[in-house]
Amino acid sequence: MDVFMKGLSKAKEGVVAAAEKTKQGVAEAAGRTKEGVLYVGSKTKEGVVHGVTTVAEKTKEQVTNVGEAVVTGVTAVAQKTVEGAGSIAAATGFGKKDHMGKGEEGASQEGILEDMPVDPDNEAYEMPSEEGYQDYEPEA
């Protein structure tokens, strides 16, 4: 029985030693895992910050582009409105067509008001002659 007890004692010592080594190995592995996780986390954070910065910069560029497009669109609409108003004024006899809608092309818009029939007493406007009108027949 002594041999048996001695064998169990040695086995116990081996298990204790193995457990110590395992505990030490697990602690070391846990420490390295923690370092690895922290490293990956910091790199991910840097990547996220860089990614967010990049997205923010691209968004800013797109907003600028959209803003420029809106301004361009509004300018085009305003120009077409002026041209349309000029055509209407010319068709109704309130101005000369060659003076209307040429402000952006560099032609002066001076003289437009002088060509308009204006009543100084603000009582009534003189109707243009019917020579400039065409008969309108609605489509059926």
Curated annotation (Swiss-Prot):
Q: Which Gene3D superfamilies match?
A: Helix hairpin bin (1.10.287.700)
> What GO MF annotations does this protein's record show?
copper ion binding; cuprous ion binding; identical protein binding
Q: For the modification Phosphotyrosine, which residues carry it?
A: Y125
Region span, Disordered: 93-140
Report the residues modified as Phosphoserine: S87, S129
N-acetylmethionine modification sites are M1
Q: Tell me, in one coarse class, where this protein mainly resides.
A: cytoplasm
| Keywords in alphabetical order | Acetylation, Cell projection, Copper, Cytoplasm, Membrane, Metal-binding, Nucleus, Phosphoprotein, Repeat, Secreted, Synapse, Ubl conjugation
Q: Basic and acidic residues composition bias: which ranges?
A: 95-105
The segment annotated Interaction with SERF1A runs over 111-140
Instruction: Identify one Gene Ontology CC term for this UniProt entry.
Output: cytosol
Q: Which PANTHER family match?
A: ALPHA-SYNUCLEIN (PTHR13820:SF5), SYNUCLEIN (PTHR13820)
Summarizing the function annotation, the protein's role is: Neuronal protein that plays several roles in synaptic activity such as regulation of synaptic vesicle trafficking and subsequent neurotransmitter release. Participates as a monomer in synaptic vesicle exocytosis by enhancing vesicle priming, fusion and dilation of exocytotic fusion pores. Mechanistically, acts by increasing local Ca(2+) release from microdomains which is essential for the enhancement of ATP-induced exocytosis.
Per the record, the similarity remark reads: Belongs to the synuclein family.
Q: What is the recorded name of this protein?
A: Alpha-synuclein
Protein source organism: Bos taurus (Bovine)
